[in-house]
Amino acid sequence: MRKMKKVLSLAMTAAMTASLLTGMGAVTASAKKSDDGKRTKITALLNSTESTEQYQVYDYLLKNFCDEKGIDYEIEMVNDKQDYFTKLQMYINSDTLPDIFGCPNGTLSKACKDIDALVDLGAELDRNGYADKMNGAVRDFLTDADDGNLYLFPQGLYCEFFMYRKDLFEKAGIKETPTTWKEFEEDCQKLADIGEIPVIIGGSDVWQIMRYLSFSPWRVTGPEFITGYQAGTDSFAKNEAAKYGVNLVYDLGTKGYFEPGFASVDYTSATNLFYGGTGGIFYSGSGQINLAEDMYDAGQIGFFPVPDTEEMDNMETNIPIHAGFGIGYNKATYDDTMQEFFDYACEHYSARLI
């Protein structure tokens, strides 16, 4: 058992700190221009399919803007998240990033910043008058911890929480939603005892497991553990809340609380499983609220926040918020046309989301 825990810890550590090789050569990215030096195309890279929100928004914005300007646009889409990260890293390594690209706030955005590939969008928002119109929580989430600048444009304002099936909780004799992780595991066992899958998870998408690994240190330390971990001043071995998170993931996985074969189930499939009627609990969020609407209105599902880590001092905040998959603008190709597009996006982005 100790060996399995060690393997899990090492796997999670590897996922958090996978080495990111940055390109060392001269910048080779350039805007698509005609012989007379005028831009002819805007390029984009998105972690999307044609049915996802971010693609539909940027396809709408780019189509209308480019039609006005008489230029073309091209959106490269990669659906699988890990494949997308690999593709984005390849562009970073070779300094050939497209004009705009989806980029998570964290290791990959830092890799972009390390090669000076990101436009300071905070300064651009100050210039075009939209700085005060951005939601403060979103701006805080995306603000760079090192220099205080804003390099990513938000996808939106989202919150995350646990959805649960009320009928299964009632059938299992669970009268209240769990407020601690100990209660969470007890409820999982009660669901298993009646032959139901306690928790649905998209285990092949590493971020899903990482959520469970991070819940305890987040509730107890806020951002302190992850920043300390990245700086090399903290570790799973030293931090009790983080150690609790490792044990939690181990218990949920080895006690059969996740669905069979969870490690090969992606997030989309997990979503379809839960909202299709399988499983008692699913970690979801406001980005999927449309899927939950009918079941919620019918009184079939409810939600609860991230539980407390028992016997530790937890912060009051128990609903994570984030800005989605941010958009970066390539500094090397940020010409007058791209600046005009950024202003156009600021003006029309919210209207397109409504």
Predicted regions span which residues?
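Conserved N-terminal structural module of periplasmic/extracytoplasmic solute-binding proteins
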Residues: 6-9, 21-115, 127-132, 176, ...
